[in-house]
């Protein structure tokens, strides 16, 4: 089965306003920049975006913030985006700041079909507000929900025509688990190779 499409605009054609998206990458590494550019061109809005970070002003998710296409961010680090800061302080953007390890596990849980889990991270802080608390082995833990997305956009090093992917170096941080947590995953690859080439190296 050939899962390759002509370009990023075709790949994202079924993404609509109001959907929840996961976008891979760690810092500025492994970001699906062509998919993000296509979303900017399409002009859809009211998006909920799940990403480790919010990009910078002129790259990554920063481009979608500039065009006011994001309604809510679920993220762990947002410190290098002045437009993000401006929108949050002006009450124009909803934000759910999640500890990085918790965000990673929420995404992994969503992809594995696990609806919720308990973690001690965040107990006794604002992170725990409104969440169920239980004690395990004398340690208080809060319940966190698994995360899913309507679509996930990832960036891979290599991919084949069947959709198998290999991620390289730091790009392996969030891309593979996000690929599992999206109902539909769209991957842009640096190199497209014939089926059977990747063999046992496949990550997803």
Segments predicted by a language model, with ranges:
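Conserved small/polar residues in nucleotide/adenosyl-binding loops
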Residues: 152, 202-204
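ATP/nucleoside-binding phosphotransfer catalytic cores, i.e., glycine-rich phosphate-binding loops
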Residues: 177-202
């Amino acid at each position: 089965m050939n899962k390759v499409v002509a370009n990023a605009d075709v790949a994202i054609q079924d993404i609509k306003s109001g959907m929840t998206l996961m976008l891979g990458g760690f810092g500025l590494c492994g970001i699906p920049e062509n998919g993000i550019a296509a979303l900017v061109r399409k002009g859809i809005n009211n998006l909920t975006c799940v990403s480790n970070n919010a990009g910078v002003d002129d790259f990554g998710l920063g481009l979608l913030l500039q065009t006011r296409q994001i309604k809510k961010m679920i993220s762990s680090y947002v410190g290098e985006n002045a437009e993000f800061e401006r929108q949050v302080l002006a009450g124009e953007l909803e934000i759910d700041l999640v500890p990085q390890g918790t965000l990673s596990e929420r995404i992994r849980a969503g992809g594995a079909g696990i609806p919720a889990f308990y973690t001690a991270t965040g107990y006794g802080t604002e992170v725990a507000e409104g969440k169920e608390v239980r004690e395990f082995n004398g340690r208080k833990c809060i319940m966190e929900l698994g995360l899913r997305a309507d679509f996930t956009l990832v960036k891979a090093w290599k991919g084949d025509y069947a959709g198998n992917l290999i991620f390289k170096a730091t790009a392996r941080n969030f891309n593979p688990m996000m690929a599992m947590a999206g109902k539909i995953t769209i991957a842009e690859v640096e190199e497209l190779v014939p089926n059977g080439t990747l063999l046992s190296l496949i990550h997803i």
